[in-house]
Amino acid sequence: MQNKVLRGILFKNVPLGYSYNRSIRHPTFGNSIIRWASTQVKTSSDVLQRSFDDHLYWTEINKQNYSSKEGWGSITKRLKGNKLTTNRSGLFNNEYLTSPEGLKLFSQVSLEKSQKIVDKLRSDRTPEGLRLYVQNLDLLSDTLCRVIDLCEFIRSSHPDYKFVEAAQDCYEEMFEFMNMLNTDVNLCFTLKHVLENKEIASKLSEEELRVGRILLEDFEKSGIYMKPEVREQFITLSQSISVIGQEFISNTDFVKDNNVVVSCNQLDSLGIDPELLSQIEKDIAGKNYKIPTYGYIPFALLKSCPSEEIREKIWVAVHNCSNEQIKRLTDLVKLRAVLSQLLGKKSYAEYQLEGKMAKNPKEVIEFIKTLMDFTKPMAAKELDGIAEKKLTIKSNGSNLSVCDILKTVRPWDRDYYSAIEREQTSAKNLYGSEEVLKYFTLGNVMQGLSNLFQKIYGIKLELDVPKIGETWSPEVRKINVISEDEGLIGIIYCDLFERSGKTSNAAHFTICCSRDISPYETEDSTTQIAIDSKGTRFQLPIISLVCNFSKTMISETDSVCFLHLPEVETLFHEMGHAMHSMLGRTKLQNISGTRCATDFVELPSILMEYFARDPRVLETIGKHYLTKETVKREMLEPHLQDLKYLQHCETYSQAKMAMLDQTLHGETISSHLDHLDVVKLYQDLERQLGVLVDDKSNWCGKFGHLFGYSAVYYSYLFDRAIASKIWGALFERNPFSRASGDKYRNSVLQWGGSRDPWHCIASALDKPELAKGDDEAIKYIGSTNQL
């Protein structure tokens, strides 16, 4: 999952508030300029693998972060001559970020710097000032976004609640400030003048023109041409949406009830594993089990409990959220509908889809419907076996139509009957899941990714030991991304092991975007700067990858993280985003890396999933953690086939979620604001669309993407269709082809968001007609059965 590559409104993702005081004095820190050579650990070639797999090795080389337990205290006590001691730093090597107070100071300093840039933008009307206008807008965007992105990450992953609170405060403040800028008539009209004046525009680069147009569109989406009171309403609504949205996303993991009560006599009589039952708490009287709705127990029962009544109770409870969460979603949907009305749009979807590859809600809905029509019969065919087993057990016979199948199989049936089916076929697979796990340690997969990237892109991943305080947990690995041509091109902080309090979803967080450092920039930077082979200074892209992989004890003192194949796929997916961030180097940050159209941003990550499912790639990665023996193809194949189990049902489920997203942000919402029932809309849509129908739970309140990917959730399916075309054209024959890697890199990755996505696809596929991005192009992309 990509974090906020949705740009939101002007200047990138999200917006902030502001407390500016010219009298504030703050320390300045020297630039950290890194030339071609990196500072990674220079030992044997297995360092990267060992750093993830050998805990004793990692704790030894990173012992400074394991032993540093003293509180950092106030930043002012630690500053010595405006610098920290050389072996200490703050988060992401930003020397402000050693404490929550330091984060607030960094935010305040950034606002002060931003205000100076705004003052210059408003006052400098010289020819040179107008020529540099877009560059300065981009610098303003970068200054604000480096706080916004940082705060977004800290809110999701930092273990210190005081840091999280400080991040929330800074985020909200910055959000307000950015929305003020988004509705600044002076800034907008000057930008419009720069773009429309032929003499000025002729001196701008293609990148500057593209960024200028994007920012002008953002101004216009903020109601810039409307009356001042309307613009004020826009700011208020946007800020309310941000606050409620953050509350919504922070509560998607919570269930309505912590347990389901089932009679002991009823559950004990069903032949369920006694060891599993022994782990379930009973009530005081000892007559009822209190089945938890979290952890592995409810899912184990969904696989093993023959009673449909009990399975349904468990499944619904696991997927139910609180009434308060439904109210948050309802308020979020209402506010977005009001915002779209304010801006003269028929729906929030219409507002959101401006500037996307699929240009309007009609195109999106047609794409989803076409995909559903194609997928539904195949999903029914996949469920046929489950339906027959269910009806056979009920002694009702079989020979079912598509309609009968879809009415028979409910969501709480899937795991139970799938387990029966797999148990009956398990004898065909000589290698159990546990055996395959032993070949795919996290370290093996990370080293395998590095080897793959070196083959197709000419870049590799190298370990670097972080300074004290540079990471938020000693378990975080710092990885330098090294190009064979240019040396260090970016940094990835890998927070991959499970830890209490962190986000439960795998995610790619942008911390700092790449951009060229202009010669006229003289102020010191708090981020790392590199120099490329042409002598150009550029801001290193910095990202954080977050996963929740668990470790397995292999002895009394040692543990290893083994990855299931779906987890390998997850890591490849997030690394796809990472490569986009690293290789999408542009002169301006507004269009670097993942700063591209929302319905294009998932392409690099989804394409990487194809590599993760290719046995040729997996054979180069899988090595037994003890014997170092390479995994055999015959061991992999059954598991790769298993990954395809009910794949069309999964695709249809994604399509249903995309349709729910369009429904909750569609035209009908505005006419139901006084009596909006999001749960009824969800359940009615489920009944209408069919396939594993859920008309019992209020799961829509747990659909977190309704905040981050509002009206654009279809992007996952859309980009999956594009990825299938690119895989077939470039990598299916040889996944290690450098020629294909270069073509893909040069056609897609290197552009970030600086090129029309349809032109990128047309170039990658050698189909110039796709550059139009018209109905025929969308139809071509949708004509695939390899999702």
UniProtKB/Swiss-Prot annotation:
Catalytic activity: Release of an N-terminal octapeptide as second stage of processing of some proteins imported into the mitochondrion
BP terms from Gene Ontology: intracellular iron ion homeostasis; peptide metabolic process; protein processing involved in protein targeting to mitochondrion; protein stabilization
Record key words, sorted: Hydrolase, Metal-binding, Metalloprotease, Mitochondrion, Protease, Transit peptide, Zinc
Cofactor note: Binds 1 zinc ion.
Compartments it resides in: Mitochondrion matrix
One Gene Ontology CC term in the entry: mitochondrial matrix
Active site positions: E574
Known EC number: 3.4.24.59
Cofactor(s) recorded in Swiss-Prot or TrEMBL: Zn(2+)
Binding site for Zn(2+): H573, H577, H580
Domain of life: Eukaryota
GO molecular function, one term: metal ion binding
InterPro entries for this protein: M3A_MIP, MetalloPept_cat_dom_sf, Neurolysin/TOP_dom2, Pept_M3A_M3B, Pept_M3A_M3B_dom
Transit peptide stretch: 1-36
Similarity remark: Belongs to the peptidase M3 family.
Known role: Cleaves proteins, imported into the mitochondrion, to their mature size. While most mitochondrial precursor proteins are processed to the mature form in one step by mitochondrial processing peptidase (MPP), the sequential cleavage by MIP of an octapeptide after initial processing by MPP is a required step for a subgroup of nuclear-encoded precursor proteins destined for the matrix or the inner membrane.
Protein name per Swiss-Prot or TrEMBL: Mitochondrial intermediate peptidase
Organism encoding this protein: Vanderwaltozyma polyspora (strain ATCC 22028 / DSM 70294 / BCRC 21397 / CBS 2163 / NBRC 10782 / NRRL Y-8283 / UCD 57-17)
